[in-house]
Amino acid sequence: MYAPECIYWVPATPEGGDPRREVAISFDDRRRLEDRIYRLRTGYAWSQAPKSRTVRMISNVEVFATERTSIRMVRSNFLISEFRVDGTRLLSGWCGHRFVQSADRWQIQVRQVNLIDCDQNLRNPSIVL
């Protein structure tokens, strides 16, 4: 699903900015994403004990062509409901994706998750958005 050279970014400001110069909620490459998934699957993600139960809704998907036929930009809105032992919370915003065509499939090169309340107290988002 993700390209070998990929970026997963959750900005900490509504404007986004430059993740290499500003604080971000998350700014991961492929290795870091694989580490997160490994910890979730093995039980070493202590912030997910017990595991969250989530429901995700994605809407308003827009696909944009670029000058290069091997690249597509996609924008969508999302709503995530997360249930934990201390209650339920909602996370919402929009995602921007840059897809690149590799051989016979499309892969995510960049995923930017823009939370509408990114500059507020998010109580340690421990799920991969």
Sequence positions of predicted segments:
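Beta-strand elements of well-folded, non-transmembrane domains
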Residues: F78-R84, R98-Q101
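A solvent-exposed, acidic/Ser-Thr-rich amphipathic alpha-helical stretch
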Residues: A3-V74
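Short, solvent-exposed loop/turn segments at secondary-structure boundaries
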Residues: D86-T88
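Generic structural "secondary-structure junction" signal
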Residues: V10, D29, L115-D117, L129
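Short beta-strand edge/turn micro-motifs at domain boundaries
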Residues: M73, S92-N124
